[in-house]
């Protein structure tokens, strides 16, 4: 059956839909499968049972869930259960409709919805705003594999006429070249998300090149469909279809697009789009599929074009995602992929191996050509070899999205069942092998490895202090400005360069973007919290008498990949410290309110990857409020540094030393000394060197220095709790000398491991103090 006639399968049925159940006929209970609904239900149950069982084993070896969908289809195919063949004769009441028609309709609907939603979530700006390299890769990777058409006549004398007539066999080779030359956006996006590199520069490059390639592919698909109609149907029909496509484009761009913009404009900010408009968009996407089917083209082209028109992100794109993504991704897409794989017949590959051997050779030849076509521009533009190879493998990845093309050419009888089965198995091998190869080949954390010191301890005395601050919510603004006020001063000897990064969870789109607020940002209006925050930082710069410079950015990113944007920006701005909120929220009275798990996970990722030092700020409210009052009145803010020892404590001390010129704060360094410390230990020597200027009253007049002797972990806890009552802000290192039994015993009770032992004590829920905490970790040296 032709792919383009799937939507036409919805017709009046002349058989019963629902049965009376198994108990209606105990002698022949399988008669229940002569009814369409029970048959469909058992097919879906079998599909998801096989998916779950497959994934139980595959996830143990790190294989993605998409491979489980494919394997489930192969298990249910002719090799084992042959569900399609056994189902096709069940609805004998009406032989015109076999037992797989309903399942096929669900499969096509899943493909249609997935394609539409994926296109809606893809930013069209990413294709033309990433420089020349992705454009070159997209164009070269589209045209270069087509040189494989020059090999289609090789060994044509060996084609068995019993397998396929000569003309048709050559057409099969052409279909293989065209399908293998394509780079489909869903496949590229999926592997980037699976590898968690979609936020990286390499991920953005691959996405941009893929979008360029897809744009060329859409137009070539339309031209190919019209050409096929011109050759195989009639000239008049081809001309009619051409006019129909032109009319469709005009209606979409001149009518539908303005209507979509009108819906977006009339939807108030932070208000959902009315359901009426969402349903109208979905109906339009379905109608566009039927429109293209009627005019002899692939049904997938309609939803593609409608999806391109709809702007990604809120309000409409995010509303469509919220309403339909889970159902599509968790129900319809697995059925669609499994159904396509169920048509794979491995026995045909073996029995007709000699007939399809050249097709297999052609497939791998196109793979090599595509790898070279992607690799060459990357090397020409001086991309490292490992990253160039990674881009090439990503753009050569074949997966579930390609099933649409394979089914189309199979149903149009351009390829044989044996060739189709090989292409399905080839995609399965891709899904299992390519991600594993890429993980070994490209580690995104490698680019954060710094061979230069990027911390505060090793900064020259009067050199710039570069800080990157991250904001998640409106309440983060006041605490961040309060912290920066401690470092700023009218008589400052060193300038401070602050980069502010607003982190926004990506909804309704795939492509992460970082936007500079030096440029005009249309997506923000004057009522948004980001706009208000930017005004607050601008006022802070004016109050600091321009001793501080502030640059602001907004990162629209996936929640579990935000660390990529933060680390990349920190590298670009050569920052010495990243300051992030802790995720723990307090009431106005200083009582515990909630923990944000997503922010905590982000902070942990930053601690593992950050290319510089990092500070985690826990604000109980009093510190930020007092800082605001202090800027207007002559109140003093008490800052305490708890020093136990180790590189993180030395980094915290270096940070606080840069606050000593601020007349509005009073700094005290409290050193906890253990009675059994080894004075010959290297860390102990470095600690004393860092504290030497504080111990001398002649050299140090701005910072108070206190030493307290402790003998056990119990005394450490008591000392920390007492100190928390005396200061507005405590600055502590994250890690200390954990070989000491006095601290290692406390690790068992830590609730927030990202804050370390002392930071966790000061941020404890049951601590009655209102002290805020800054936990500092010095830049980690990795190899």
Curated annotation (Swiss-Prot):
The keyword Acetylation does not apply. Belongs to the monovalent cation:proton antiporter 2 (CPA2) transporter (TC 2.A.37) family. CHX (TC 2.A.37.4) subfamily. It is found in: Membrane. Specifically expressed in pollen. The chain crosses the membrane at residues 31-51, 61-81, 100-120, 135-155, 175-195, 206-226, 244-264, 276-295, 300-322, 356-376, 389-409, 418-438. InterPro entries: Cation/H_exchanger_TM (IPR006153), CPA2_transporter (IPR050794), Na+/solute_symporter_sf (IPR038770). It is a multi-pass membrane protein. Keywords: Antiport, Ion transport, Membrane, Potassium, Potassium transport, Transmembrane, Transmembrane helix, Transport. Pfam families: CHX17_2nd (PF23256), CHX17_C (PF23259), Na_H_Exchanger (PF00999). One of its GO terms (cellular component) is membrane. This is Cation/H(+) antiporter 10. Its main location: membrane. It comes from the Eukaryota. One of its GO terms (molecular function) is antiporter activity. May operate as a cation/H(+) antiporter. It comes from Arabidopsis thaliana (Mouse-ear cress). The gene is CHX10. One of its GO terms (biological process) is proton transmembrane transport.
